[in-house]
């Protein structure tokens, strides 16, 4: 019964991972005759490169921006939908739905919503909040916020699920 998943794991996860780790110690162009051992040189060149540190800083910034908002939002929603309330099953389904959508689809949806001619700009201009459409993706920080918002929208449902499970396991005597 477990043979098929284990074989799948070995073939599609473990073997490629070990092969990539092995290749990281070699100079490799895809041509076997040009491959030679370089040891720590690949790692040293990565740690010396500016793009690596820029990506690292962006990743830390993304996490610092996303996690407090996502966890606060997820806990707040979990408190409201935990327990046996009428309609809570519907809401649990609705907040979890974005989690099963592909990241690429989420990117397309948000780029269309927040694009220069997107629905958000159109709505804000019609309501008189903006005089002209905003280019949400033009600046570094505004683009980062758009990515954070899209990521929160997609993934907070799983955190809500975790919080609801935890809250439903709290004994009723502990509530005031």
Model regions and ranges:
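A structural signal for multi-pass alpha-helical bundles of membrane permease subunits
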Residues: 1-176
């Amino acid at each position: 019964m477990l043979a098929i998943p284990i074989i799948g794991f070995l073939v599609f996860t473990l073997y490629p991972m070990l092969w990539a780790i092995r290749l990281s110690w070699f100079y490799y162009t895809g041509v076997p005759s040009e491959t030679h051992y370089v040891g720590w040189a690949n790692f040293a060149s990565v740690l010396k490169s500016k793009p690596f540190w820029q990506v690292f800083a962006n990743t830390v910034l993304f996490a610092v921006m996303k996690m407090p908002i996502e966890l606060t939002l997820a806990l707040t929603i979990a408190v409201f939908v935990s327990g046996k309330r009428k309609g809570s099953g519907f809401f649990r389904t609705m907040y979890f739905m974005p989690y099963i959508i592909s990241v690429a689809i989420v990117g397309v949806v948000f780029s269309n919503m927040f694009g220069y001619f997107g629905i958000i700009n159109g709505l804000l201009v019609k309501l008189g909040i903006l005089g002209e459409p905003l280019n949400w993706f033009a600046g570094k920080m505004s683009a980062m916020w758009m990515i954070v918002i899209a990521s929160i929208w997609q993934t907070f449902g799983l955190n809500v699920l975790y919080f609801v499970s935890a809250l439903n396991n709290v004994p009723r005597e502990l509530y005031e």
